[in-house]
A protein has these predicted regions:
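The feature marks the first
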Residues: 2-53
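Short, solvent-exposed interaction modules
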Residues: 34, 74-127
Length: 154
């Protein structure tokens, strides 16, 4: 399992098709956005420079750092065409933050013939759990879900 992974800045192998050029928002950044309560649109992300995007990937995820990130994103996006990124309530108590294995993730694993136990779930890093929850949610195309299961359940 990957419980020792740095959840703040780790990018998954299944994200390799856009790492480097950062044409999509990687899951490590999406997790930080949820934690600091910012709705950053893809248009906002794409308007940022490569260096700014990399800085968001590398940004730490401690409490103080997340508050600084929230303000930084307000400042960066204020002059953008889509306007300032919207504030949301910071996520607390989300399924990926819980010890219980979410039914949607369990069902997605079962459908794909993947064995995922509660013990495995509790040993995953918060970022791993975040990725599985995001990729397994209804309405998502599930394009990278099998690769995500393979990567995080090693």
């Amino acid at each position: 399992m990957s419980s020792r992974r740095n959840s703040a800045s780790h990018c998954f192998a299944f994200e390799q098709d856009f790492i480097g050029n950062w044409r999509c928002i990687p899951l490590c950044v999406r997790r930080k956005l949820d934690l600091c309560g910012v709705k950053l649109k893809l248009n906002h992300w794409l308007e940022l420079s490569q260096e700014q995007r990399q800085a968001l990937v590398d940004w730490p995820d401690g409490v103080d750092a997340l508050e600084q990130l929230r303000q930084h994103l307000r400042d960066c996006t204020r002059p953008m065409a889509d306007g300032m990124a919207k504030d949301l309530p910071p996520v607390s108590g989300a399924p990926w933050q819980q010890a219980e294995l979410p039914a949607v993730v369990q069902e997605a694993a079962t459908v794909r013939g993947v064995v995922l136990t509660l013990e495995q779930w509790t040993q995953l890093s918060e970022l791993d759990r975040f990725a599985l929850c995001k990729l397994a949610r209804p309405g998502h195309d599930h394009h990278n879900l099998e690769a995500a299961f393979s990567e995080v359940l090693v």
